[in-house]
Swiss-Prot record:
It comes from Plasmodium berghei (strain Anka). The gene is PMVII. Residues 96-438 form the Peptidase A1 domain. PROSITE patterns: ASP_PROTEASE, PEPTIDASE_A1. Keywords: Aspartyl protease, Cytoplasm, Hydrolase, Protease, Signal, Zymogen. Belongs to the peptidase A1 family. It is found in: Cytoplasm. The keyword Transferase does not apply. Disulfide bonds: none annotated. Its EC number is 3.4.23.-. This is Plasmepsin VII.
Length: 471
């Protein structure tokens, strides 16, 4: 029997493995603390690069006092949600989470994982048997809570099965707050009454907000995914925002930009975003990776990590539906690609990093001139991008591993996790069903790239239209 950590892996998030969902029966004022972000706390929770990017916020006092910070309204018209990074030293893992509140006139404050690789939105209910130490926040019913009923008029009950446990609960509705004055009424939420997943005891986040699309399970239960709810109820557009969000992460934290694009997170404010069309049939944000190729490091006096002459040639392994996943750490490649083309992508010491090639992803695009009937863009990862540096806790030495691993389930698609997303400010456009990529502002170097240790194990993806996570 495989251990939990074989599935749990280097990946730090919970990916929902949605199986059979069964349908049968089963007051206080809002705390100001959630939406108060003092300048000192703000400084302590971002790295120096991010502080340079956000330096102009020093004089923006009216905006600092919000969990969602409204910035550059006339220019960018974007909301900013802070992501906190948690390092789990004992298991050599990391995770990013944000804060929300649930319920009118309540103190239901939660740390949540924002996950484009799942659809479910769940938090633990107050009676939930969750962890031994009872360290997680739990939901108490509010005046704005409503049950969701099935077609028999009974409360809708769910069971979600994971590889290492299960979650049981019921469906309901309540108001979700992302900041003062930014409420999302009547949001579909699953309230867990029993969670038998021991590894959750290690995480600071309490639940998951799935940012994926409708799938077979949500259709069966009559659940509207979170992003669909935002769009259908015009939560953003009525406030003159767009139905898009961006994902920007650094070595110490990050931000979700909601409703617009924050140009300060680009490497250059004027740098163009390149877009790839999204397909939704799998329930995830999937794009077509047409192939990849390797290039030797270019010789130049002032090298930029993605500055390489692109060529529309190289190794093409066919059009693969691939997931852009904010809940996965590594990049997972099709097994045949690792075996047939990237089999020499190995490293014995950190010094070997200089010998590694640039990896160029050839991705279907809407905009670039057509090549053999396909519109193609190329995104580049340097060895600095995909090699993970860490400190060996036993020997206190710097070690390196490759952040691109094989998907052992023989699934043809890729999973672009946070190793990839750390290099690109990534925009998820709900209205136009496209994902935008632009090199981010963060400069990664040998000393600051990653100082945490990570456990090198594997994650599995299941058959089409389902997704296996680390549990």
């Amino acid at each position: 029997m495989k251990s939990v950590y074989h599935h749990f892996a280097i990946i730090f998030f919970l990916k929902l493995f949605l199986c059979n969902c069964i349908l049968s029966i089963p007051k206080k004022t809002l705390g100001k603390g959630l939406f108060s972000l003092g300048l000192n706390e703000f400084k302590n929770n971002v790295d120096n690069n991010s502080l340079n990017i956000l330096g102009e916020l020093k004089n923006s006092k009216p905006f600092i006092n919000k969990s969602f910070i409204q910035i550059n309204e006339k220019k960018d018209n974007v909301l900013l949600l802070k992501l906190y990074k948690q390092n789990i030293a004992s298991d050599k893992l990391s995770t990013y989470y944000g804060k929300i509140a649930i319920g009118e006139n309540s103190e239901n404050i939660f740390n949540v994982l924002f996950d484009t690789g799942s659809t479910e939105f769940w938090v633990p209910f107050k009676t939930c048997k969750f962890t031994k130490n009872n360290i997680h926040n739990k939901y108490e019913r509010t005046q704005s809570f409503k049950y969701k009923y099935d077609d028999k008029g009974l409360p809708s009950v769910l069971e979600i099965n994971y590889l290492s446990g299960k979650l049981v609960g019921f469906d309901g509705y309540d108001t979700v707050y992302l900041g003062p004055g930014f409420a999302i009424p009547h949001t579909n939420i699953a309230f867990a009454t029993s969670i038998d997943i021991p590894v959750l005891e290690k995480f600071k986040w309490d639940g998951i907000i799935g940012l994926g699309f409708e799938n077979e399970d949500s259709q069966k239960r009559g659940i509207k995914p979170f992003l669909d709810h935002l769009k259908d109820e015009k939560i953003l557009t009525e406030k003159n925002y767009k139905n898009i969000f961006g994902y920007y992460i650094t070595n110490t934290g990050g931000y979700i930009t909601l409703g617009g694009i924050d140009n300060r997170f680009k490497r250059s404010p004027d740098e163009k975003i390149i877009w790839s069309p999204v397909s939704t049939e799998m329930g995830f944000w999937t794009i077509d990776i047409l192939g990849i190729r390797k290039e030797k490091q270019p010789y130049m006096n002032e090298r930029r990590d993605d500055e390489v002459i692109v060529k529309y040639e190289g190794f093409h392994d066919g059009s693969n539906k691939s997931i852009v996943d904010t809940g996965t750490f590594l990049i997972y490649a099709p097994k045949k690609t690792i075996e047939n083309y990237l089999n020499d992508l190995t490293i014995n010491s950190c010094e070997d990093k200089q010998k590694l090639p640039y990896i160029i992803f050839q991705i279907k695009s809407k905009e670039i001139e057509s090549i053999k009937g396909l519109s193609v863009i190329e995104l580049v990862l340097s060895p600095n991008d995909y090699v993970i540096e860490y400190i060996d806790e036993v020997n206190s030495t710097k070690e390196c591993i490759i952040g691109i691993q094989s998907d052992e389930d023989n699934i043809n698609g890729w999973t672009l996790g946070q190793v990839f997303l750390k290099s690109y400010y990534t925009i998820f456009d709900k209205d136009n069903l496209q994902i935008g990529f632009v090199r981010n502002k963060q400069t990664i170097n040998d000393e600051t790239y990653l100082n945490e240790s990570f456990l090198r194990v594997s994650k599995k993806r299941n058959k089409k239209k389902s997704y296996n996570g680390p549990l």
